[in-house]
Protein backbone atom coordinates (compact mmCIF):
# COMPACT_ATOMS: atom_id res chain seq x y z
CA UNK A 1 0.00 0.00 0.00
CA UNK A 2 1.28 3.47 -0.86
CA UNK A 3 0.65 6.04 1.85
CA UNK A 4 -0.03 9.58 0.65
CA UNK A 5 0.35 12.11 3.48
CA UNK A 6 -2.68 14.37 3.70
CA UNK A 7 -3.26 17.93 4.81
CA UNK A 8 -5.27 18.81 7.92
CA UNK A 9 -9.02 19.21 7.72
CA UNK A 10 -9.45 22.48 5.85
CA UNK A 11 -11.47 21.33 2.85
CA UNK A 12 -12.86 18.26 1.20
CA UNK A 13 -10.32 16.57 -1.04
CA UNK A 14 -11.41 14.50 -4.00
CA UNK A 15 -8.91 12.00 -5.27
CA UNK A 16 -9.46 10.85 -8.81
CA UNK A 17 -7.59 7.64 -9.47
CA UNK A 18 -8.17 6.53 -13.02
CA UNK A 19 -6.69 3.47 -14.66
CA UNK A 20 -5.93 4.30 -18.27
CA UNK A 21 -5.65 1.09 -20.23
CA UNK A 22 -7.01 2.08 -23.67
CA UNK A 23 -6.30 5.64 -24.89
CA UNK A 24 -9.97 6.71 -24.59
CA UNK A 25 -10.58 5.36 -21.07
CA UNK A 26 -10.71 8.84 -19.51
CA UNK A 27 -13.26 10.01 -22.06
CA UNK A 28 -15.59 7.07 -21.48
CA UNK A 29 -15.63 7.18 -17.67
CA UNK A 30 -14.31 10.13 -15.65
CA UNK A 31 -16.34 9.55 -12.47
CA UNK A 32 -14.51 9.86 -9.11
CA UNK A 33 -13.72 6.41 -7.81
CA UNK A 34 -12.29 7.37 -4.43
CA UNK A 35 -13.47 10.11 -2.10
CA UNK A 36 -11.68 11.44 0.95
CA UNK A 37 -13.26 14.13 3.11
CA UNK A 38 -13.09 15.61 6.57
CA UNK A 39 -15.89 16.58 8.93
CA UNK A 40 -15.39 19.02 11.81
CA UNK A 41 -17.89 19.03 14.69
CA UNK A 42 -18.17 21.40 17.64
CA UNK A 43 -20.19 19.99 20.55
CA UNK A 44 -21.42 22.48 23.15
CA UNK A 45 -22.63 21.62 26.65
CA UNK A 46 -24.44 24.28 28.69
CA UNK A 47 -23.52 27.06 26.29
CA UNK A 48 -19.75 27.34 26.03
CA UNK A 49 -19.07 26.05 29.53
CA UNK A 50 -17.80 22.80 28.06
CA UNK A 51 -16.81 22.47 24.40
CA UNK A 52 -15.60 19.43 22.50
CA UNK A 53 -13.99 19.51 19.05
CA UNK A 54 -14.29 16.37 16.97
CA UNK A 55 -12.49 16.20 13.62
CA UNK A 56 -13.25 13.06 11.60
CA UNK A 57 -11.58 11.84 8.40
CA UNK A 58 -13.36 9.53 5.95
CA UNK A 59 -12.26 7.50 2.96
CA UNK A 60 -15.03 6.05 0.78
CA UNK A 61 -17.61 6.75 3.52
CA UNK A 62 -15.56 4.86 6.14
CA UNK A 63 -14.03 6.78 9.03
CA UNK A 64 -10.35 6.00 9.45
CA UNK A 65 -8.95 8.83 11.59
CA UNK A 66 -10.18 11.34 14.14
CA UNK A 67 -9.01 14.10 16.44
CA UNK A 68 -10.87 14.43 19.74
CA UNK A 69 -10.10 17.50 21.86
CA UNK A 70 -11.10 15.55 24.99
CA UNK A 71 -8.26 13.12 24.20
CA UNK A 72 -5.90 15.77 22.85
CA UNK A 73 -4.41 13.79 19.98
CA UNK A 74 -5.23 11.93 16.78
CA UNK A 75 -6.60 8.41 16.95
CA UNK A 76 -6.56 5.85 14.12
CA UNK A 77 -10.01 4.31 13.70
CA UNK A 78 -8.72 1.87 11.06
CA UNK A 79 -5.27 0.82 9.85
CA UNK A 80 -5.61 3.25 6.94
CA UNK A 81 -5.48 6.19 9.34
CA UNK A 82 -2.57 4.95 11.44
CA UNK A 83 0.27 6.56 9.41
CA UNK A 84 -1.38 10.00 9.57
CA UNK A 85 -2.14 9.62 13.28
CA UNK A 86 1.50 8.78 14.04
CA UNK A 87 2.76 11.58 11.81
CA UNK A 88 0.58 14.34 13.30
CA UNK A 89 0.95 13.13 16.89
CA UNK A 90 4.72 13.48 16.51
CA UNK A 91 4.35 17.24 15.88
CA UNK A 92 3.86 19.01 19.27
CA UNK A 93 3.22 22.45 17.74
CA UNK A 94 0.57 21.07 15.41
CA UNK A 95 -1.16 19.25 18.27
CA UNK A 96 -1.23 22.44 20.35
CA UNK A 97 -2.81 24.25 17.40
CA UNK A 98 -5.54 21.59 17.12
CA UNK A 99 -6.24 21.71 20.86
CA UNK A 100 -6.49 25.50 20.73
CA UNK A 101 -9.19 25.29 18.05
CA UNK A 102 -11.69 24.59 20.83
CA UNK A 103 -11.36 28.34 21.52
CA UNK A 104 -10.18 29.76 18.19
CA UNK A 105 -12.80 27.92 16.12
CA UNK A 106 -15.63 26.48 18.23
CA UNK A 107 -16.12 29.18 20.86
CA UNK A 108 -15.37 31.89 18.30
CA UNK A 109 -18.07 30.64 15.92
CA UNK A 110 -20.50 30.18 18.81
CA UNK A 111 -20.24 33.87 19.72
CA UNK A 112 -20.82 34.92 16.11
CA UNK A 113 -23.84 32.67 15.57
CA UNK A 114 -25.31 33.12 19.06
CA UNK A 115 -27.94 35.73 18.12
CA UNK A 116 -29.32 34.20 14.92
CA UNK A 117 -28.83 30.49 15.69
CA UNK A 118 -28.44 29.72 19.38
CA UNK A 119 -31.11 32.14 20.59
CA UNK A 120 -33.49 31.60 17.68
CA UNK A 121 -36.90 30.27 18.77
CA UNK A 122 -39.91 29.29 16.66
CA UNK A 123 -43.02 27.96 18.40
CA UNK A 124 -44.45 24.65 17.14
CA UNK A 125 -47.90 24.17 15.61
CA UNK A 126 -49.67 21.20 17.22
CA UNK A 127 -52.65 19.27 15.82
CA UNK A 128 -54.20 15.95 16.83
CA UNK A 129 -56.29 13.66 14.62
CA UNK A 130 -57.13 9.96 14.16
CA UNK A 131 -55.92 8.13 11.05
CA UNK A 132 -59.24 6.25 10.75
CA UNK A 133 -62.84 7.47 11.00
CA UNK A 134 -64.18 4.11 12.09
CA UNK A 135 -66.44 3.48 15.14
CA UNK A 136 -65.11 3.32 18.67
CA UNK A 137 -63.75 0.16 20.28
CA UNK A 138 -61.74 -0.54 17.13
CA UNK A 139 -57.98 -0.26 16.72
CA UNK A 140 -56.96 3.25 15.70
CA UNK A 141 -53.87 5.41 15.42
CA UNK A 142 -53.96 8.89 16.95
CA UNK A 143 -51.50 11.31 15.39
CA UNK A 144 -49.93 14.28 17.14
CA UNK A 145 -48.47 16.48 14.41
CA UNK A 146 -45.87 18.97 15.63
CA UNK A 147 -44.56 21.23 12.87
CA UNK A 148 -42.55 24.35 12.06
CA UNK A 149 -40.47 24.63 15.25
CA UNK A 150 -36.87 25.56 16.07
CA UNK A 151 -34.56 24.42 17.63
CA UNK A 152 -34.94 20.68 17.14
CA UNK A 153 -34.93 19.54 20.77
CA UNK A 154 -38.56 18.80 21.61
CA UNK A 155 -40.51 16.46 23.90
CA UNK A 156 -43.90 15.04 22.89
CA UNK A 157 -45.96 12.91 25.29
CA UNK A 158 -49.36 11.20 25.10
CA UNK A 159 -51.90 11.04 27.95
CA UNK A 160 -55.15 9.11 28.25
CA UNK A 161 -57.58 10.47 30.84
CA UNK A 162 -54.68 12.32 32.47
CA UNK A 163 -52.40 9.29 32.70
CA UNK A 164 -49.26 9.19 30.55
CA UNK A 165 -49.10 6.45 27.93
CA UNK A 166 -45.74 4.67 27.80
CA UNK A 167 -46.46 1.91 25.27
CA UNK A 168 -47.84 1.83 21.75
CA UNK A 169 -46.07 5.04 20.75
CA UNK A 170 -44.45 5.37 17.32
CA UNK A 171 -42.53 8.41 16.08
CA UNK A 172 -41.14 9.55 12.74
CA UNK A 173 -38.26 11.19 14.54
CA UNK A 174 -37.06 14.69 13.77
CA UNK A 175 -37.62 15.75 10.14
CA UNK A 176 -35.89 18.82 8.68
CA UNK A 177 -38.10 21.10 6.60
CA UNK A 178 -35.16 22.75 4.85
CA UNK A 179 -36.06 26.25 6.09
CA UNK A 180 -34.44 26.12 9.55
CA UNK A 181 -37.53 24.49 11.07
CA UNK A 182 -38.41 20.92 12.01
CA UNK A 183 -41.45 18.68 12.18
CA UNK A 184 -42.34 15.34 13.74
CA UNK A 185 -45.26 12.96 14.06
CA UNK A 186 -45.80 11.07 17.31
CA UNK A 187 -48.51 8.41 17.02
CA UNK A 188 -50.36 6.45 19.68
CA UNK A 189 -51.79 3.01 18.91
CA UNK A 190 -54.97 2.55 20.92
CA UNK A 191 -58.56 1.29 20.99
CA UNK A 192 -60.61 4.39 21.89
CA UNK A 193 -63.52 3.95 24.29
CA UNK A 194 -66.48 6.31 24.54
CA UNK A 195 -65.79 9.23 26.87
CA UNK A 196 -62.01 8.87 26.88
CA UNK A 197 -59.90 12.00 26.53
CA UNK A 198 -56.51 11.76 24.80
CA UNK A 199 -54.03 14.59 25.21
CA UNK A 200 -50.85 15.36 23.31
CA UNK A 201 -48.44 17.46 25.37
CA UNK A 202 -45.54 19.29 23.74
CA UNK A 203 -42.58 20.89 25.53
CA UNK A 204 -40.17 23.10 23.60
CA UNK A 205 -37.61 25.86 24.42
CA UNK A 206 -39.79 28.42 22.61
CA UNK A 207 -42.69 27.78 25.02
CA UNK A 208 -42.99 29.13 28.55
CA UNK A 209 -45.55 26.40 29.33
CA UNK A 210 -46.29 23.06 27.63
CA UNK A 211 -48.86 23.06 24.82
CA UNK A 212 -51.68 20.51 25.18
CA UNK A 213 -54.18 19.49 22.50
CA UNK A 214 -57.07 17.15 23.33
CA UNK A 215 -58.98 14.57 21.29
CA UNK A 216 -62.20 13.18 22.78
CA UNK A 217 -63.49 9.75 21.87
CA UNK A 218 -67.17 10.02 20.93
CA UNK A 219 -69.66 7.38 19.83
CA UNK A 220 -71.28 7.59 16.40
CA UNK A 221 -74.60 8.70 17.91
CA UNK A 222 -72.90 11.46 19.89
CA UNK A 223 -71.07 12.64 16.78
CA UNK A 224 -74.33 12.64 14.82
CA UNK A 225 -76.05 14.67 17.55
CA UNK A 226 -73.20 17.16 17.56
CA UNK A 227 -73.28 17.45 13.77
CA UNK A 228 -77.07 17.89 13.87
CA UNK A 229 -76.69 20.64 16.45
CA UNK A 230 -74.04 22.41 14.39
CA UNK A 231 -76.15 22.03 11.25
CA UNK A 232 -79.23 23.43 13.01
CA UNK A 233 -77.23 26.37 14.33
CA UNK A 234 -75.86 27.21 10.86
CA UNK A 235 -79.34 26.86 9.34
CA UNK A 236 -80.75 29.20 11.98
CA UNK A 237 -78.10 31.79 11.17
CA UNK A 238 -79.00 31.58 7.48
CA UNK A 239 -82.72 32.12 8.16
CA UNK A 240 -81.94 34.99 10.53
CA UNK A 241 -79.72 36.64 7.94
CA UNK A 242 -82.37 36.25 5.23
CA UNK A 243 -85.07 37.70 7.50
CA UNK A 244 -82.95 40.72 8.41
CA UNK A 245 -82.12 41.32 4.76
CA UNK A 246 -85.82 41.31 3.75
CA UNK A 247 -86.75 43.53 6.70
CA UNK A 248 -84.16 46.22 5.97
CA UNK A 249 -84.91 46.14 2.25
CA UNK A 250 -88.62 46.79 2.94
CA UNK A 251 -87.76 49.58 5.35
CA UNK A 252 -85.60 51.26 2.73
CA UNK A 253 -88.36 50.98 0.12
CA UNK A 254 -90.96 52.56 2.40
CA UNK A 255 -88.75 55.50 3.34
CA UNK A 256 -88.24 56.25 -0.34
CA UNK A 257 -92.02 56.64 -1.07
CA UNK A 258 -93.46 60.17 -1.28
CA UNK A 259 -97.13 61.21 -0.44
CA UNK A 260 -99.19 62.07 -3.54
CA UNK A 261 -99.92 65.76 -4.26
CA UNK A 262 -96.61 67.08 -2.93
CA UNK A 263 -94.34 68.99 -5.31
CA UNK A 264 -90.72 68.17 -5.34
Swiss-Prot record:
Residues 124-214 form the Ig-like C1-type domain. Residues 247-264 are cytoplasmic. Residues 122-225 are annotated as: Beta-2. Coiled coil: none annotated. Residues 1-26 form the signal peptide. GO terms for biological process: adaptive immune response; antigen processing and presentation of exogenous peptide antigen via MHC class II. Residues 27-121 are annotated as: Beta-1. Disulfide bonds join 38-106, 144-200. Keywords: Adaptive immunity, Disulfide bond, Glycoprotein, Immunity, Membrane, MHC II, Signal, Transmembrane, Transmembrane helix, Ubl conjugation. Ubiquitinated in immature dendritic cells leading to down-regulation of MHC class II. It is found in: Membrane. The keyword Transmembrane helix applies. The chain crosses the membrane at residues 226-246. Its main location: membrane. Residues 27-225 are extracellular. GO terms for cellular component: MHC class II protein complex. PROSITE patterns: IG_LIKE, IG_MHC. Glycans are attached at residue 46. Belongs to the MHC class II family. This is H-2 class II histocompatibility antigen, E-B beta chain. It comes from Mus musculus (Mouse).
Amino acid sequence: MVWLPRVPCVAAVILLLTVLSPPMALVRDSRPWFLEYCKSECHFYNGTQRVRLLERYFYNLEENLRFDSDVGEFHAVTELGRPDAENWNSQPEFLEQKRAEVDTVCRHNYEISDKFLVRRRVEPTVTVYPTKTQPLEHHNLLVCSVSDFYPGNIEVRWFRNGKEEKTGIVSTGLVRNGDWTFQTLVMLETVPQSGEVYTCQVEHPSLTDPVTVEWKAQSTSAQNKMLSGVGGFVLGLLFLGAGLFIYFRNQKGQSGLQPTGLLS
